[in-house]
Amino acid sequence: MIARMSTRRRAREIVLQLLYEADLNDWRDAATSRKFIRSRLQGRKVLTDFAAELLDGTMARRDDIDAKLTKLSTNWALHRMPVTDRNVLRLGAYEILYSGTPGQVAISEALTLAKRYGGENSPRFINGVLDRLFKYHSNPESVSS
């Protein structure tokens, strides 16, 4: 189980790299992204498929995810957030909303990414936003607009 979690974590790290890149540059095509993922995950099909699903899903639903994050990230415009934080939030939000990953697992994994790649305040900020998103997704009346 530990190996599975750490390898899935590695897949998430690779997806974060690609989301970061897509945020700053033109989006790679899916074939180029899959090739990058496959090379970083040493061709492991299950992990490559997992990473590709996270990347493709996050990119396909980015506008919807951004709208939800904007609504729930009080006093923070998405475009003003650090690029890393914004993309950790997008990935975590995709997992909570669409992937079937349990909410607490998605939040925990996002916090791990934030601690590793974000700034000093990133984990606390990301935890707050994703926790609100998870609560809202679970029960829309639980979070005020």
Swiss-Prot record:
Keyword field: RNA-binding, Transcription, Transcription antitermination, Transcription regulation
GO cellular component: cytosol
Gene Ontology biological-process annotations: DNA-templated transcription termination; transcription antitermination
Signal peptide from the UniProt entry: none
Disulfide bridges in this chain: none
Pfam short name (any one): NusB
Molecular-function GO term, any one: RNA binding
Superkingdom of this protein's organism: Bacteria
UniProt-listed HAMAP family: NusB
NCBIfam families: nusB
Record family assignment: Belongs to the NusB family.
Job description of the protein: Involved in transcription antitermination. Required for transcription of ribosomal RNA (rRNA) genes. Binds specifically to the boxA antiterminator sequence of the ribosomal RNA (rrn) operons.
Name of this chain's protein: Transcription antitermination protein NusB
Organism: Rhodopirellula baltica (strain DSM 10527 / NCIMB 13988 / SH1)
